[in-house]
Every structure is written in C-alpha cells, then in structure tokens.
A protein has these predicted regions:
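Extended, charged catalytic domains and RNA/DNA-binding interfaces, predominantly
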Residues: 1-414
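A short, hydrophobic C-terminal helix/tail in secreted or cell-surface proteins
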Residues: 415-422
Length: 422
C-alpha cells in the first residue's frame, strides 16, 4: 500500500543539545536504533562509530558556547556528510540576508555559519530540516531536504545522503540541477577548467539564481520583476492557492475542491503547515494535530481537506496552500468550491494579477488566487566556464531565491555546494 511504502522510507531521529559543541541531530537507518547514552557530542560520535547513523549540526548560527555550532569539532566523512543551513530557527548561510535568528536563544553570528565553515576548508553537503515543534514533519516554510537518488528506496536515499547528493530548501520544491565538470552536488572533483551547468525550476517567479565561488558571486541570473504573459492561447503555468487569514482563534476547516473547466491539471503540490507555536502550550497536557490532506487528484480537479488558523502576527504565516501545475487556455477558469462558497477566475485574469475573496466578510477567512506564473518566470538555465583557480581547493554552490522569499541551496531558498578540488 501507499502508506506502507511511505513507512519503508522513514528514518528515526532525535536531537542532543550541547553548549560547547552546538546542537546535533541523529538520523538512524535502523528503525529500532537505541538512544545513545553519552556525556558529550564527541563521546556520542565515538559511540556511534560503526553504526548507520548521521550526526548533523543543527541551527548552526547561534553564538559559540551557547548551543551555536563549534566548527572545531567538525569531522569530514560518512558520519557527518552534511550540515543544516536552514530550519525554523532561520538561515545560517552567513550572518547576512534573509531569515535572521529571532528565537530567544539569541542572534545569528558569523562564526557558526556555513560560509565560515567553507572558508575553513571543510567539505560537506547542505540540507534543511523543519525542527517543527508541533508534531508536523515537513511543515511548509520551515525547511526541507532534497535528495538526488536513483530511486525512492530506503537504501538509495540513504546512499544519496551519505554521498552528499543533497540540497536545502526553505519550503517550495525548487529543483536545482547543478553540475561541475559532470559532477553532481556534493562531489569533489579535480581540474583546472570548470564547466558549470545550472538549471533551476521553481514553484513561483524566480528573483535570482547565484553561482557562488569561494564566498563571492561568480554569476547572477535575474528573473523578471513582473512575469510576462506568453503569446498564444494555451499556457503552462503554476498557480498557488492560499487558504487562511481571519481574526478568530478557532481553526477553520476547509473542505472542497479546486477544478478546471478547460485544459489539464498536471499536478498538485502541497504547502501544508503545522501549528505556528510549540505544543503543547502552557497549561495544556496534549495537543491535537490537525492533518491537512490532498484527498484526490485527477487531470481536472483536486479535492482538499485542510485546517487553517489565524496568522499569529504580521510576519508569521499560518495559511494552508497548494500549487496547481496547469496547462489551459487563457479563457479557461480555475474554480474554488469550499465550505458552500464558489469563486472562479480565468487564467487570463490571473496572468494579470492575484485575486482574493473573503468567505463571510471582512476579517473572516479568505481564499487567495495568486498570480499565475508562466514557465518563463520560474525556470532559469545557465552554462559557463570558469578557468581561474583561486585556491588549492575552490568551493562552489548555487542558491536560488524566488520573489516570494522561498529559497533553495545547492542555495534557493538554499542550493547545495558542489566542491572542486584542483
């Protein structure tokens, strides 16, 4: 069954804290792997040798000595093939840029970051993970790992993790094909001339794609400020549909469907969030997780069952969403039927801009038909050669950023660094 297939691809993990070495997460191959009794992170690593486990630095950018990462304890190899660049705590690429650390554990600083570790000459893959504290693994916007594997078996996924064929993303499934002299992300290769190929497919309009070399931008490819509607009648687009907002404390239960009256629905990507707080809350002994589901999908419609809560503040989103991959004529309609209400817009309207609707009235829950994104705005392809070695070992990585703030790294959000040994 589909459920058993998903179970077969799961790995068990747990977290350990350390003021001296920084927090780490263990990811075990064996589902019955025991908790390791240890006195320090270094003791943990020693006791874990010989076992199929990855020990990964977590929320790295905090101050050293206060659960920020201590690069002096990094050991390259199969036990720590990758490090975490992004999680719900924020972005640890550097001490600049998007997603600063806002947790009460303190600010983001330079010595714990990814770029600091790369400048020390360390070699590692880059990933992201949610650290979601309300029982919702993969919560949208809190971080996810991408894996380049030949199949979705546990062994193939594990081997791809071990060989650093991974990348990081904040939320959207931004696909990055990054090659250097035919090597893939995470590989170490030799050569003076470097053929660089990058192909990025986003879920929304791309802001820019950077190729980073030794901490500096080697090349930047910019996306459009405003997507341009393509010529012709039939268009391939991605349209994000958001559900949420409102002022009330109670959850809104969304039941209904999204459908097309013309054209074809190629796919539906979930953007489902867990609760935007640590659970259980003070005074509570348990917390009920509201599970969001894509109930069904065919080439014309998708049925959804979702729960949204009000946004806890003006900078933290709690909406639920899906992204529709559609191919349809401009006069074709995208129809939303939820909780007894029906709203519809043509693709032509959505190519001009977004449209929103309150379900009951002002300050009630709402549906947002986001601007339709044609292929030209969410795809970037670039080829170049770099013939100037700068160090004994130069490092490269790619980062992609969408205009909606989503990243991946190999960086978009964040892209995995591919490292070249000269």
């Amino acid at each position: 069954s589909a459920a058993s297939d998903v179970y077969k691809r799961q790995f068990i993990g747990y977290e350990a804290h350390s003021m001296e070495h920084g927090d780490h997460v263990a990811l075990n191959y064996d589902l019955d792997a025991p908790l390791v009794e240890c006195t320090s992170i270094e003791d943990w690593k020693q006791k874990a040798k010989g076992h199929k486990v990855f020990i990964t630095p977590h929320h790295m950018g905090y101050q050293g000595g206060y659960r920020g990462y201590n690069w002096k304890c990094f050991t390259e190899g199969d036990q720590t093939p990758f490090v975490e660049m992004y999680s719900r705590h924020g972005l640890a690429e550097s001490d600049q840029g998007d997603y600063p650390y806002l947790h009460d554990m303190g600010p983001r600083q330079w010595e714990g970051t990814i770029q600091y570790g790369l400048e020390l000459g360390n070699k590692f893959g880059i990933m992201a993970s949610t650290d979601q504290h309300s029982g919702y693994p993969g919560s949208y916007g809190d971080g996810r790992i991408g894996v380049l594997a030949p199949s979705l078996t546990r062994d193939a996924i594990w081997d791809a993790l071990r060989t650093r064929h991974v990348c990081a993303a904040t939320g959207d499934k931004i696909l990055i094909d990054f090659r250097l002299n035919d090597a893939f992300m995470g590989d170490v290769v030799r050569g003076n001339s470097r053929r660089i190929y990058v192909n990025v497919t986003g879920e929304s309009c791309i802001d820019y794609v950077d190729i980073i070399k030794n901490g500096q931008i080697l090349a930047r490819m910019n996306g459009p400020l405003t997507p341009v509607a393509p010529e012709g009648d039939t268009v391939r687009c991605k349209v994000k549909m958001d559900f949420g907002w409102n002022r009330e404390e109670q959850y809104v239960h969304w039941q209904g469907k999204l459908s097309l009256d013309k054209g074809k629905l190629h796919g539906v990507t979930p953007c489902f969030r867990g609760a935007a707080f640590t659970s259980p809350q003070e005074g509570e002994t348990e917390f009920h997780t509201h599970v969001n589901r894509i109930v069904s999908v065919n080439d014309k419609e998708t049925e959804l069952d979702m729960y949204s809560s009000k946004n806890p503040n003006t900078t933290t989103a709690a909406m639920q969403a899906v992204i529709l991959d559609v191919e349809m004529p401009k006069d074709g309609k995208i129809i939303a039927e939820f909780n007894g209400k029906k709203f519809e817009h043509t693709l032509g309207e959505l190519l001009e801009g977004s449209r929103s609707h309150f379900m009951i009235g002002w300050l009630s829950e709402a549906i947002l038909f986001n601007r339709a994104m044609p292929e030209s705005c969410f795809t970037v392809e670039h080829y170049m050669e770099d013939k100037e070695p700068q160090r004994d070992t130069d490092y490269y990585y790619v980062r992609a950023r969408q205009r909606d703030g989503q990243w991946a790294v190999s960086y978009t959000h964040l892209t995995l660094p591919t490292i070249l040994r000269v």
